[in-house]
Amino acid sequence: QQVPTLARRMLKKFRGIYAASELDHARLLELGCPAERIHSTGSIKFDVAIGERCTEEARTTLREDLGFSAGDKKVFILLGSSTWAGEEIALLEAQRTVITAGIDCRLLLVPRHAERAPELLQLLKAQDLPWYQRSTGGVVPENLGIHLADTTGELAYLSQTADLAFIGKSLAPNDGGQT
């Protein structure tokens, strides 16, 4: 119940939001996004074959596999998609703000360049939340706060777990978005 209130406040700050599907359009409406700001565009990636959406059961399993389960409790997953230097700090601050508001928020970080992992590990080591580095393999601990997906080719798959996605290179001083 708290998630929609927070999402509604955040979504009202956007001039326009582009939904990749009718399902995404409906979810944005449910979160309280003003209808006049939602534009259904379909996928704007013209060179990528879109796979099937995972079922709700598969989504739950994927969340558990990422260490983002909390039993019957609702977990809000924030995705940092194709992030660039400096954006992870903003995402960690956003996560902290949401947690302070009483919402169980987990962060899935997928940097644009996996070779930035050493830099990101230094940042994660300073956090007070349990984290995991995907490229190390092995057993993912349960009840993670942050999952660093420093792997290549998994973004579309991992994105299906998110409740809200931040797209990298969209904060100042960056200009022009992803290339």
Predicted regions and their residues:
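Short active-site oxyanion
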Residues: 12-16, 76-77, 105-107, 145-146
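Thr-Gly-centered strand-to-loop micro-motif
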Residues: 13, 29, 79-81, 110-111, ...
